[in-house]
Amino acid sequence: MENLHNYIVAGHKFGICLPEGMSAQHLLKPYEPFAVDDDQQVLFTLRLEMVDNLRTVASEKVLKCLNDEPPYFWIFEEEDGSYSFGFSYTKTHPDCILKVPSASDESVVYVTKDGAEKLAEFAISNAVMLLYTFYTAPYDTMMVHASVIAHEGHGYMFLGRSGTGKSTHSRLWLNHIPDTELLNDDNPVIRVFDSKALVYGTPWSGKTPCYKNMQVPLKAVVRLSQAPYNKIARLAPLQAFASLMPACSCKRWDNEAMSSLHKSVEKTITMVPCYHLECLPDEEAARVCYNAVLAE
């Protein structure tokens, strides 16, 4: 019996198919708020399969191993010129392999049988996020590495390099700015429509369990950098593009995907003001930011 579970994130439906007998209760818990049972067509389906050895499904031609910290991202070239992917906790070898057939919307992520209990959640999470960015790019949809809070019905997105203090700044708003809640703490999604940009909660929120199926109009995007003072400035369009673009997940080796992302970022920055906040991790930083972004 097929163990298929369907979800909608930012209006895009996808499925996750587990091996028969494998429980979704713990493995797919972050996805529960996004679960659906309807007839809408799925963009893609991910199937989890277990093998004795990953070498039986992995290409021997490794093109790249990317990222400065886990999860490490592997790119393999197949004999037919297509790509497959891997994810791992270390740079020694991939812990799972993702195959994305060009002629089908069903992909497969493989884990070893002896590592399935430990690695299944890791494999599914990383594979689904990658597939989501692939398949939603043509629909003005961007997954962003950011922390987002909702305040009085609007979303405020904080960008920055790892360790800059995105989550810390969100917590400062939660602690000091009334009527504020956390929407997502690691991988929110922006979707652009004709006259507005919306930001959505997702099942992917990093170390913070914040899986909210809600969306709000995106009111501001703020890139953070650490400083011994608190100062904020609005960015010009070119600066805004350069600020948002690197934070977006994308298949950067694919010209078509990159073209879609460029257009989506351009649309976003024409609708949403972008800022640079040089700041300390203190209450004043939240208030300086609040006063600037709500003045628009």
Predicted regions and their residues:
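Hydrophobic positions on the alpha1 helix immediately C-terminal to the Walker A/P-loop
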Residues: H169
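A noncatalytic interaction/capping subdomain that flanks phosphate/NTP-handling catalytic cores
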Residues: M1-M157, S162, L172-E181, V189-E296
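Conserved glycine(s) of the Walker
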Residues: G165
